[in-house]
């Protein structure tokens, strides 16, 4: 197989770039001139007949044993129907639309398997079938994986990537991930070079980034790669280097980590080679914030805080402590009084003693305290502290004032005119806080649902366009368009198409992959800011026009539980629709995603029960848990914690003098039936939970395995 040394690599990539430009020109020319070598319908039909015939032969008991002879026969038959005899030497028949032939896919699956015993060389097969235009990204993915994981030949992987670039004009995240791993495994490397890797991956050409998230997934799923310490060290170095050069991008990557395990992987890799005395405090606090966002009960934010708190400069340490204040405000507690006590302990122990030190901005501390008191629900204490304890000089600070005004808008009944009067009295001018702009705009939408003038004036006065491609501002503008355009004669308004237009207007040169990612992020924020479930349902109904990604589907599903006018039964209908294909069978992709969808259902219903104390919903929760075996999903500790939390909240609410029958039956279900539903799930109950089940009246409470309280 051809091997490319690093000295020739850049030249090869330039050649690939030339081929890309050349193919673009050829496609333009061919749009007006019909090629003489187009495959005729008859020839295409014969190709599919061959595919069906040889797929059947390969499926026979002796098919894999005879794979070499089958392939040679298939190739001979291809030659018979090819157009090489037309005198156009070197021009292959255009089977480009047939790159997903099942026989070729299964052929590559077999010959790139670690247990393959045939003499067929995957590279030779790829070369031969490329002449017929029958090789696509899927086959390249299999062969790159083979040379990386089976053959441990990183230079060959890079050679194949260059060959792919010569043939195709679109990027492929999996191929880029395999190529990056191969680059990191090159034997003659000292330290990874970001610019060199970006040239190899052609990130500028494709308007993409190094696919770190995909690389992490590939490494974590392969034991050999996981145990490769040199690879781990080089990858950690590369990630740190790239994060330093592209901090905004890296923070966005943390924002789209939707599982605690993925975020933990990013943190472990980021911190592996990071000098703790030279860390980026914004990234560290972002890790804390995101861990808390994904799991409010997670102890990991405190672990991060304790790891860094004594090793930072005064200024950076102060920012870390501000992050702690935010985490504590969101951490679950039996009452808002206990949350208040925790917040004041952090304030008095960590933050107030820092005032007066060089580089310490007390206004940030007061703004953070206001935000934390608001988040924890202690609005009365917040107003008391604002009036009596915050010095006037800080009340006149725009950052502090906007934090206070945001809390007032979210926690009290205040009109838009009253809000505007407060803003006008300060003489600050344009708003700085995106969150405040969002809260005010939602107030405007609520008060002026039929006239866009007030919103348009507010938008212009504060120059919200100056925030550029800010996700929240674009989502806000989209929600405004939804509110006002759907109430006019514009019946063709499509939410996702509107967002796409906004993104492409701001970034006309953006790649398809990148604009789709931005559109999805804006739609996620659109779902978050929508105060009602109605626009979210409209977005779901329009999914046939714009394909919603899996994250959006989960968010739409969860909105039925989270929005005040959401409906549990409608959530169940959406769940059923997402899980079914046209023939009403669960598809393979949805089997892979079903744990996350099921987790969304469990989390959502638990939140509704905890919020409403509606014990009539417990049978529904039992039904969800009983569905797990049929979906091939296992119970998780995180789900169990959420379930137990709802039981505690209802039990301690004291809303009824007697224990509700539904609560008793559900408690018995958890103790008696859940172990049979998932025998592999072994949960250690806390002593106080066992005591709670006893007080509820669950007769089988003594069967529970306990751990410390």
Swiss-Prot record:
Task: Give any single GO term for biological process.
Answer: meiotic cell cycle
- Keywords of the record: DNA recombination, Meiosis, Mitochondrion, Transit peptide
Q: Which GO terms describe its cellular component?
A: mitochondrion
Subcellular locations according to the entry: Mitochondrion
Q: Which domain of life is it from?
A: Eukaryota
Where does the protein principally reside?
mitochondrion
Q: Where does the transit peptide start and end?
A: 1-29
Q: What does this protein do?
A: May be involved in the control of meiotic sister-chromatid recombination.
Question: What name has this protein been given in UniProt?
Answer: Meiotic sister-chromatid recombination protein 6, mitochondrial
What organism is this sequence from?
Candida glabrata (strain ATCC 2001 / BCRC 20586 / JCM 3761 / NBRC 0622 / NRRL Y-65 / CBS 138) (Yeast)
Write the gene name: MSC6
